[in-house]
Every structure is written in C-alpha cells, then in structure tokens.
Amino acid sequence: MKNKLRDKYPLYLANEPLQPNVSLKVEDKYTGEAVTSVALADAEIIERAIVAADDCFEKMINMASYERQEVLLHCVQRFREDFDEFAYALCVEAGKPIRDSRGEVSRLIDTFKIAAEESTRIYGEIQPLDISERAKGYRGMWKRVPIGPCSFISPFNFPLNLAAHKIAPAIAAGCPFVMKPASKTPLGAILIGGILAETNLPKGAFSILPASRDGSDLFTIDERFKLLSFTGSPEVGWDLKARSGKKKVVLELGGNAAVIIDKDSDIDSVVDRVIFGAFYQSGQSCISVQRVIVHEKIYDKFKKKFVEKTKKLISG
C-alpha cells in the first residue's frame, strides 16, 4: 500500500473546504508522532454552519428521492476508488491493523449503499377511519418527512463506520447536518466530506467540523437542530440529553455485553471467542465483552484456560 497523508486537511463548512488554521494535530497512534494537521472550528464557524443548515432545509426537502439516491451512489463509487486512502488514514489515526481498517471501509461502502436503496423507499400509509356511521367514507393518510437540521457527534473508535451511520441516512431522508467528529480521529469524516463536496447537494446540506470545546455546546443546545445523534460514553451521552432541550435525541452509548457459557460448550473455542470479544481494539467497542457468566461445572476449567491465553496477548 503506497499511501501517505496530506500535510493538512480542511474542515467542511456548508459543503465547502475551509482552512482557517492547522490547529488540530493528528497522531500516528502507533508511533505517537504528529503526522498531519486538521482545521479546527471555533464558535463563529459552528454558528455559520448551523445557519447554513437551517437555510438549506427547504432545498433538501424539495430534492427528489432519485436525486438523493444519486448523491449516495456517487459516494459509493468514490469510496471504492479511494479505498486504500481511506484504509490507510484509518490505520494511522486510529491505530488499527490494516486488515481491520479495510473491513471498516467496506462497512462504510455498505452503509451508503443501503442508504441509497432506502432513499427511494420512504413510504407512508393510508388507513380507514370509518369506525362509526359519522365517519363513513373517511380515510387518513400519513407520510414520513425530514425532521430538520441534525447535529451529529461521532466517536473515535470507529471513525468511518459510526460517521457513516449518521451521514448516509440523513442524506437519504433529506436532512441537512452538522457533524463534530472525534478530535482524536477526524480524518475519516473529513475524507467523507471531500467526496460529498463533489455532489450536487444544496449549499449548507452538510458541514463537518472538528472542534474544541469553544462553541461546541451549540451542537447540543441550539434549538435550530431538531435532532441530536451522539455516539460515545454513557456519562457524556446522558449529560448531553439533559441539556438538549426539546429536540429529539438518539444515543448510542457504551454497552455491558455478557457471554453465557453453558456446561456443554466447547471450552477451547469459547475461550478464543471471549478473548477476541473482550480485547479486540483494546476493548474500545460498544459491544465488547464485559461480563462472562460460566456454568459452575466448567468454571475452573474455563478460568484456567482463559487466564493462560490472556497472558499471551501482545499489546501494541
């Protein structure tokens, strides 16, 4: 793989790249060295992004479903073309093995492909209302409509996958958005922004803003946002929900996943699976194994093998 990072990366404000500074340093997670720089948004830039998203909403509503689908399919094609660049950037900024990075890029492509397919299948329903003589001949209709400008805050552990889970459905539904990617791993979302900027999305449809705490409260409290989607720790997520006002809030927080091991389980196989589930990516996954419930008849045998194999893990 012959790839390298650029010297600097912009943020994206109302569909356009902007390089006001190079304040955010991105580290190679393996060496700990700064390898590139990213533009950092301040409160004024965040405000401009929200204004643009709010102004753009009517234009997003008026996009035909096939037009939104074309945007998403363009992204699918471009992600495939730039597959190695995405994988390399993820490998460096997140410290993932290149095999896992490639897997996450594939998941990015799949997510946008599914969103493209669903963008033309946003249905409504007709239902009878003739429950009495007075209502004879009456029917009711409902349809799904875009909720409005969305605020997205994505985490560091799956910079592409978890950004895609927010961005692609928003485009499919016709919702403008402003995203704050994790400061530790901003490159994935910025690369997505670069490809979105090639499309005919109306100005203001998206902004991708790495940001410090200066002004970041706007992602949570600003009433022009009609939905906040946050992926991260329970402590932060519940605090954001408490301060978010009347907007809808979607929280994807840390889990408490359990494994149940019965007495007739293949212990060698189970031990390998539990170790992988618990220690993959240093346990930095919302579905990492955090509880192991073992039948008492095999507890000692499982514990012995589990400890032996865990001691052989190599960090770094």
Feature annotation, model-predicted:
Residues 1-138:
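N-terminal Rossmann-like NAD(P)+-binding subdomain of aldehyde/semialdehyde dehydrogenases
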Residues 32, 68, 90, 112, ...:
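Residue-level signal for inorganic ion chemistry
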Residues 33-37, 201, 260, 314:
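Conserved C-terminal structural/oligomerization subdomain of aldehyde/semialdehyde dehydrogenase
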Residues 43, 158, 280:
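Glycine-rich phosphate/pyrophosphate-binding beta-alpha loops
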Residues 50, 72, 108-109, 115, ...:
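A general structural signal for well-ordered alpha-helical segments in protein cores
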Residues 74-78, 82-85, 191, 195-201, ...:
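Generic non-transmembrane alpha-helical segments
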Residues 124, 128-269:
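Rossmann-like NAD(P) dinucleotide-binding subdomain of oxidoreductase/dehydrogenase enzymes
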Residues 235-316:
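ALDH superfamily catalytic-core signature
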